[in-house]
Amino acid sequence: MEQHGGSSSQKPHAMCIPYPAQGHINPMLKLAKLLHARGFHVTFVNTDYNHRRILQSRGPHALNGLPSFRFETIPDGLPWTDVDAKQDMLKLIDSTINNCLAPFKDLILRLNSGSDIPPVSCIISDASMSFTIDAAEELKIPVVLLWTNSATALILYLHYQKLIEKEIIPLKDSSDLKKHLETEIDWIPSMKKIKLKDFPDFVTTTNPQDPMISFILHVTGRIKRASAIFINTFEKLEHNVLLSLRSLLPQIYSVGPFQILENREIDKNSEIRKLGLNLWEEETESLDWLDTKAEKAVIYVNFGSLTVLTSEQILEFAWGLARSGKEFLWVVRSGMVDGDDSILPAEFLSETKNRGMLIKGWCSQEKVLSHPAIGGFLTHCGWNSTLESLYAGVPMICWPFFADQLTNRKFCCEDWGIGMEIGEEVKRERVETVVKELMDGEKGKRLREKVVEWRRLAEEASAPPLGSSYVNFETVVNKVLTCHTIRST
């Protein structure tokens, strides 16, 4: 690649590419905005499937971008289906591994052949899009990976190979699964009293060629080649785990929560702050509804972008909320219920019409959680949701669905003291009891005090000039991302 003339060529240009799922897109977009605030030209790359979904949900001009923050797309090989269709995880994984490298490199070369923008000087990639490492090495530019889950999840994933070698996974059969999941694993650094049930749930497979296990090994086997690895966490939350991780991957930097850095550094009324990439249409009425409610009176319910409930489960949640007598705001997105999105019975809707609001789409979760009316969060324990709830000072009721959400549940409820368990099997009586306890009980009060303390520590980590996340972010920006000189190749 040739360096372009003119002052614009001296401006660093970050190519940012998330894994194409909502929970991965959100933190990457925040990271891209933070780089833009530090003077980077940013190209944000979506795959075709999600590019179309964003245009459907946010309108035809949603991806126009700004002169120094542009959106591009690469083909992903996925068929175009209904905009609200649930993405097939295995197809998504297969398509990114097999289809994205060549068009990604072609995009970089095309951008570098123009004269209106500086050449791409670094790649910021989701760790799950590890083909970008090959592109960076070929083009001789640094690549920083973003790990969008917790540091704890990463250290567990890094030991999946050892679980296989010790013949702990895959299971021989699933006949005694419950007993097997109680197996204590005592040989992972910084992990005390952790059981298989607390691992991301791919450990339950009986398939020696399980594609998710293969994908985990594929990703964790490649990340050591990255120039640096960002984790959206902060030192005091996962201190011991981060120390252990750095003995395996010295280039790890805790730089979260991104939400705090974004709030500190980017004006809320700026054009860059307004850029969004939600895959579902976002409603705007919930905040007005919350304005009519008393402080900490409402429980917010959202199971994330990938959770699929059975009709029985959603009915148990519904009647548990009804029986609690509490006001609630519940996101019931399209595709959330297996087979029937309109399963909520008329009796439930009638009984709760004056104290419940249902959102049939998507909402600005950060704004909802930070609203004074929110007193609790019934959540699937996705990592973004966990950090957003922590930052808002809102305690959680934890009902994980899959993957690292089970790990997050364990640490929220047992180690960090910010969550309550609802149990794997959903029963309306249990939902009622836990909601009441969180909103009104002594345990709920203790959790609320603890989460407020964690929020204070998160803010300390993000504060200049000496906060750990602030210093780590500055270190990578200055020593990895902006020190690279484009040379002819």
Curated annotation (Swiss-Prot):
* Key words, A-Z: Glycosyltransferase, Transferase
Q: In which tissues is it expressed?
A: Expressed in roots and shoots.
Root EC class: transferase
Recorded hits in SUPFAM superfamilies, A to Z, give: UDP-Glycosyltransferase/glycogen phosphorylase
Binding positions for UDP-alpha-D-glucose per the UniProt entry: 305, 363-365, 380-388, 402-405
UniProt-listed Enzyme Commission number(s): 2.4.1.-
Q: Which organism is it from?
A: Arabidopsis thaliana (Mouse-ear cress)
The record, for InterPro entries, names:
UDP_glucos_trans, UDP_glycos_trans_CS
Q: Which GO terms describe its molecular function?
A: glucuronosyltransferase activity; UDP-glucosyltransferase activity
- Please give the name of this protein: UDP-glycosyltransferase 85A4
**Name of the encoding gene:** UGT85A4
Q: What is the lineage of its organism?
A: Eukaryota, Viridiplantae, Streptophyta, Embryophyta, Tracheophyta
Which segments of the protein form a coiled coil according to its record?
Answer: none
By sequence similarity, the record places it as follows: Belongs to the UDP-glycosyltransferase family.
Pfam families associated with the record: UDPGT
